[in-house]
Curated annotation (Swiss-Prot):
This is ADP-ribosylation factor-like protein 8a. May play a role in lysosome motility. May play a role in chromosome segregation. It comes from Arabidopsis thaliana. InterPro entries: Arl8a/8b, P-loop_NTPase, Small_GTP-bd, Small_GTPase_ARF/SAR. It comes from the Eukaryota.
Length: 184
């Protein structure tokens, strides 16, 4: 980054604060909490405890403050997903791209959620996680398996990531920052 660009970014940060609220959803063991930790600290741990209910964490990237709702993915918590997805800047749906056995359930849960009228038009970011594992789907295969091309009522974006290796995490953060709302 050049000196002039750095100065302009600093100047902008004095006058413009950006905020966004996100809901991270997906089936259990997809890597939602790992994603929160990688975005917040850059750290990854193999020993994750399943999220019971939800966790909230605020992360600041540059002049953007991101409020992350990390929602449990077990069947008993899925009914509360809609409540935490209303009025967010974007819905982030995490999929274990190396677990083909759960893709049909994951697709069904996603499409059921997005059919709720309270969520109309909210941008969707689908993250195929665990691409470091053998047999992980490609972006094209995940897009097809999840029926993402049929979602025409909102912006839909898909990235393939690895929380373990931090693969494409910068792209995810860039997408999130671009979808934040200015608060001056």
């Amino acid at each position: 980054m050049g000196l002039l660009e750095a100065f302009l970014n600093w100047l902008r940060s004095l006058f413009f604060k950006q905020e966004m609220e996100l809901s991270l959803i997906g089936l259990q063991n997809a890597g939602k909490t790992s994603l929160v930790n990688v975005v917040a600290t850059g750290g990854y741990s193999e020993d994750m405890i399943p999220t019971v209910g939800f966790n909230m964490r605020k992360v600041t990237k540059g002049n953007v403050t991101i409020k992350l709702w990390d929602l449990g993915g077990q069947p008993r918590f899925r009914s509360m997903w809609e409540r935490y997805c209303r009025a967010v800047s974007a819905i982030v749906y995490v999929v274990d791209a190396a677990d083909p056995d759960n893709l049909s359930v994951s697709k069904s849960e996603l499409h059921d959620l997005l059919s709720k009228t309270s969520l109309n038009g909210i941008p969707l970011l689908v993250l195929g996680n665990k691409i470091d594992k053998p047999g992980a789907l490609s972006k094209e295969a995940l897009t097809d398996e999840m029926g993402l091309t049929s979602l025409t009522d909102r912006e839909v974006c898909c990235f393939m990531i690895s929380c373990k290796n931090s693969t494409n995490i910068d792209q995810v953060i860039d997408w999130l920052v671009k979808h934040s709302k200015s608060k001056n």
